[in-house]
Amino acid sequence: MAMVGLFWITEGCVYLGAKPTGTAPGVRLTGEGVEVLGDGQGGRFWGWDEVRGLDVRDVAVRSSGRRLASMAFDSVVVLLTGDGEHPPLFTVCVETERDGTVEASALAAVAGGIHTPDEYALSRTLLARLADGTTPVGQLLGWRREEPEDVAPTKDQRLALLREWTTASV
């Protein structure tokens, strides 16, 4: 598994945000389509031919410096109070012709739940390309299968991958 932008990429599928466990909320992207997971929102699936758009809202976005400061502050609060939080939620909007726009929750997977502006913008562009078919999910899965399992891409590598996936022609 590897985290690139808003995407948790495994060898078999891609999650928006963290891979959910148990009854936790989430959204899974496969070669076949989009599936909403989790207690109270799960069980919905649309094939790619039904999906008209994908977008996200409520994602924490800060510059790299502000992101580090926020994470440091959160760490101090946890050390002093012992009260850690669950990862923050964000909203995934799945637009379909039949059901209109369906909103689902997903858990942030990055440290502190905060993304940089570049990651966020490129991730939203990639979501649009996944929805319109110009970038197939298989391209992300193929990259993951070729990478060593225990190696996580660096920040620069993650941004380069997002740029590659958002500019590649079909």
Describe each model-derived feature in a short phrase.
Residues 1-26, 37-43, 53-170:
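Eukaryotic intrinsically disordered, low-complexity regulatory linkers and tails enriched in Ser/Thr/Pro
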